[in-house]
Amino acid sequence: MSVIVDIRGREVLDSRGNPTVEAEVVLESGVVATALVPSGASTGETEAVELRDGDKNRFKGKGVLKAVDNINTKIADLLIGENALDQVRIDRLMLELDGTENKSNLGANAILAVSLAVARAAAMELDIPLYRYLGGTNAKVLPVPLMNVINGGAHADNNLDFQEFMIVPVFGGRFKEALRCGVEIFHTLKTVLKDKGYSTNVGDEGGFAPALNSTKEALDILMDAIKKAGYEPGEDVLLAIDAASTEFYDKERKVYRFEGEELTADDMIVLYEEIEGTYPIISIEDGLAEDDIEGWKKLTKALGDKIQLVGDDLFTTNPKLIKKGIEEGIANSVLVKLNQIGSLTETLDAIELAKVASYTNVISHRSGETEDTFIADLAVATNAGQIKTGSASRTDRIAKYNQLLRIEEELGEDAVFKGKEAYSKFIR
């Protein structure tokens, strides 16, 4: 009854109004499951290829009819008759059919949509929650949310070079209490920004994008909002930054164009040490450019035992790159984005590889999201302990938080929320 009898692809829209792919998988039992894939704004050079049509007369070239057609023809022909319960085989068949290193033939968006829809169909067929199907009986850890409340860089039209300033609520002993803490700070932040005369329009990920002029100003405003919301920085709430530094790195001259200056990797490391010493920063993502491997080695040596150093563009959820990074001793954490690698099996391989090496995992959304909540289940399934899924506004972000609330309720007394303990290897 778990045999796949039909697969359909369709072109739908993401949270930025750009086309994306939805896949629908039908099983012999009558189960119908769908999955939608997201899209990023700042992308690593080694990410799997998101197949776009390039027809400037449709959606300014961003249509995905080619990827949809690949689902409706090549992938459907390949997988109809296969068992949805054999996820590894399903994904392997698609990867073999594609035949490229970066999935440029079928498109990572086509492969991933089908991969996720098959997993969801299998869970429905077995009548168990998706997180339980993916993670087994020990899937029970609710993630600490890293909430992007101030946007800069490629996510905003302001003077902030760093892309994301996040609050990390570790308060309350339960996910729902930590989320409440984060939401209350978000609303307080809005008031703080208004009182200072700043705009409170929200960006792609639901955070504010005020015309702030420096990293220090952004962090000071966050500290103020945390205190005014009634919480203690460093105890109830930690801070995190996504520098997305590849975006302001001059590859030729090997300098970072940051806040009007040209800085070396050593200068950036000094900057991070100063920030970490002044504010309750627990995590820095993409602190240096994906090509600056020597810089990454120095950064890891300087701060790797004090804070979480997350590789996003550095690793692009690619097991081969993660393995190489582990061998070189760079970073200590992996940002996990399903569409960077383009299949569920490879994503789970990446997560496991990081765990074995004692690297932390942060499950992540993309800036162009959908209403699909797969990453919420993935976070619990893998006991990752952390999730990045935006601020406390925009339905595409809130959908993931709401799914996590449901999962925590369903798990009842078995649910685990580690809070500050999620960072025990860094907090002495």
UniProtKB/Swiss-Prot annotation:
Catalyzes the reversible conversion of 2-phosphoglycerate (2-PG) into phosphoenolpyruvate (PEP). It is essential for the degradation of carbohydrates via glycolysis. Its EC number is 4.2.1.11. This is Enolase. It is found in: Cytoplasm; Secreted; Cell surface. Mg(2+) binds at residues 242, 285, 312. Its cofactor is Mg(2+). GO terms for cellular component: cell surface; extracellular region; phosphopyruvate hydratase complex. The active site is at residues 205, 337. One of its GO terms (molecular function) is magnesium ion binding. NCBIfam families: eno (TIGR01060).
